[in-house]
Each structure stands twice: as structure tokens, then as C-alpha cells.
Amino acid sequence: MSPGSGSSSVTIGSAGTIDPMPSAVLATGRAPRDTSPMSFATSLTNHFLIAMPGLDDPNFSRTVTYVCEHTEQGAMGIVINRPMDIKLGEVLEQLDIEPSVAGVSDAQVFLGGPVQTDRGFVIHSGPTEYDSTLTVTADLRVTTSKDVLEAIAAGQGPAQCLVALGYAGWGGGQLEQELSANAWLSGPADAQILFSKPVGERWLAAARL
């Protein structure tokens, strides 16, 4: 589902593992360019990327991105402070899921990034794994399969979760170059900021970690 659109369909429910970069695209949504990547030193998996004030890309200005995976081949993250104009109830309706718990339909949906904005991602607490779950840490996972939303709608889902459409992706070496150019501040992820902190406070809170 595209931001502000009620007619596009949401894609969630494919089984198997998550492909961190399904289309080998960058965070901008363009094909990778030859960047002569820097050497890979430290993985930022389970870290926040906090956009620096000078980052004027409209896709990432004043954003906080949760890095789900970061290897020599590239990185994938979900923006956690860009609420969309839709609620979870609209996503559930498109997937023919009937919520049986009060309040579920009112949960916020976030724009996770500019790539594949019709694809759903759920960042959630553990330990349950679903049909298509990437285990990030012992306590945090990312799931793209429909069964996690069915569990949430039935009141049997994870204790904490964040639902997003789309993701941010970086080709090999690109994120390292952006960090060297001071586009991002990085810091360890914090579950309270990820799930509980008011959206408007997440950028400053993450920057203070």
C-alpha cells in the first residue's frame, strides 16, 4: 500500500526466509551504482540509524531506522518514526483478517522505507517464530508472513510489535560510505524507543543513546 492510498494491495504472507534486499536496490529505490565499497568492519545489525540534521533526503530526513541486517553484501532497515495515514485495521481488511480484539484495528502503521512500499514487515518481540521470520536478536525478530498478523488480530501475537510497509536497503559498502560522510549517527537499538516512545520523540531519544 502506498502512502495515502487506499486502493493498492499489501503483500505479506510469502513463506520462507526474508531476502534482505529482494531487488538489490538502494535506499533510494535505484539500482546499485559502483561505489568502490569500503572494507566491512562492524555490523550494525540491531542498531538505530539516526538521520543527521544535514541529511535532506525527503525519504530519511529526521528518521530513525532499525537495522535488521547488515553484512558485507549490504544492509536492510525499517524506519520506525514515519507514521502513515492508515491504521492496521485497513491492512487486516485487505488481507481478509477479522480482528477479534478491541483496539487492534487502531494500531499505527509506519512507512518503513521507500523500497517495496506494498510489502509488509512486522518488527516484534520474541520468542515466537512464524512462517517467514528473521531472528535479529534473542528478543527481537522481523516477520513478513501473514500468520503474525493473524495472531495479532486474535490477541495471540507478540507482546510488542511495529507494523511497517516498505523498507530501506543499501548495497554493499554504501551504508559505510554514508556513515563516513556523516549522514547518519548510529547507536544500539532500544526496545522502549522502538515500541513505546511517542513517535514524535523517537528521533531525539535515539540520538541521545
Predicted regions and their residues:
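A short aromatic-anchored loop/beta-hairpin motif
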Residues: 37-163, 168-209
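Low-acidity, Ser/Thr- and Arg-rich intrinsically disordered low-complexity segments
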Residues: 2-14, 23, 30, 36
